[in-house]
Regions:
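Exposed beta-sheet edge and beta->alpha loop/turn motif
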Residues: 1-44, 48-52, 153-215
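Core segments of small alpha/beta cavity-forming domains
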Residues: 77-146, 215
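Structured interaction patches on ligand/partner-binding surfaces of diverse proteins
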Residues: 52-80
Length: 215
């Protein structure tokens, strides 16, 4: 069988019958790489895809003349998911505190993936949050306390990206319409977070906070 193609995450390794397949000639695109095996005898093989921090994928494949290969995505390990949940909490708090201080997108861009740098929507959405916080026409936001973060996987990972739903306890402090100190608390406040792996680091591809989060 000639030219079998397997598409896997760019940092992963492919092996057949415990032999790692050379990926030096692989093509890469959007966080994935495609490994083409020039020739393979027909028969049954144990295929395995592994990557640090991800659950290994293993299956038996029956290679025949009608076999063309496949695309495989990996699930994060429990340790990786827990670490990403903690990172999401840190990143959300950082973005909220930065917006509260009126910082520009340029001052927070290091938490985002390189693909976001050309995405004006994310930059504009962040500026909307800053503008909402800084707008004191109706109420004046004086402080935020976001804690008790909990993350769960949201759908299947794809193209080296992992999406999560993060819940947290939200405490918002502000001066209300009548000039009195007030606060609003909500448990289970949801944030939708997507991370992309770049050079071994997980970076945000979307803005997890929005102007509608505030009173």
């Amino acid at each position: 069988v000639e030219n079998l193609s397997y598409t896997i995450p760019v940092d992963a390794s492919l092996s057949l019958n415990d032999k790692v397949i050379d990926d030096s000639s692989a093509t890469t695109d959007d966080g994935q790489k495609t490994i083409t095996i020039p020739y393979l005898f027909t028969g049954k093989y144990q295929l395995q895809v592994t990557e640090d921090g991800m659950k290994p994928y293993s299956e038996y494949v029956d290679v025949s003349y009608s076999t063309y290969g496949e695309s495989i995505n990996l699930l994060p390990s429990e340790e990786t998911l827990a670490a990403l949940g903690e990172q999401a909490g840190t990143d959300i708090k950082f973005l909220l505190e930065s917006a509260l201080q009126g910082k520009s997108f340029k001052e927070v861009q290091d938490v985002f993936a390189s693909t976001v740098m050309d995405n004006s929507a994310v930059k504009n959405d962040y500026q909307d949050v800053v503008d909402r916080i800084q707008n004191t026409d109706s109420i004046k936001l004086t402080g935020l306390d976001v804690s008790d973060f909990n993350a769960t996987l949201d759908g299947q990972p794809y193209n080296n990206e992992i999406s999560m739903i993060v819940t947290a306890t939200w405490n918002e402090y502000y001066i209300n319409y009548w000039g009195n100190a007030d606060n609003y608390q909500e448990t289970g406040r949801k944030f939708y977070v997507t991370y992309r792996k770049e050079d071994g680091q997980w970076k945000l591809t979307t803005l997890p906070i929005a102007s509608y989060h505030f009173v």
